[in-house]
């Protein structure tokens, strides 16, 4: 990942990058995207400075990845009747999440959901389609990006 003068180690989807992203394909979508918002665990990161809209992650929050739901690719609250990914995790990968504006306007069913920039596992293990970076680099990015910042994935 390159940002201004910084070269940032990252992990991507375990099946690579694609222009034909589909739900569950374990691929990172190719294209030019913007950042929508920032979600974070206030119990783990009490103060966060960002020009993005900030959302505090609560225990009952998730992201719908079920294309049969009208809430597909949106933030939801549990209990929820459709499949959704929990955002409150014991591991730290979702302590900070930057929502990438992929498949948002319009939302196309089965096109892919929950594409985030989040914290990488210690060994930079591949993701299910997200981009993951170190916590240190995440702090650097969140202090400098805003909704106009472009993310180019190719």
Where are these regions (language model features)?
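Cell wall/extracellular polymer interaction/catalysis modules
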Residues: 1-128, 135-154
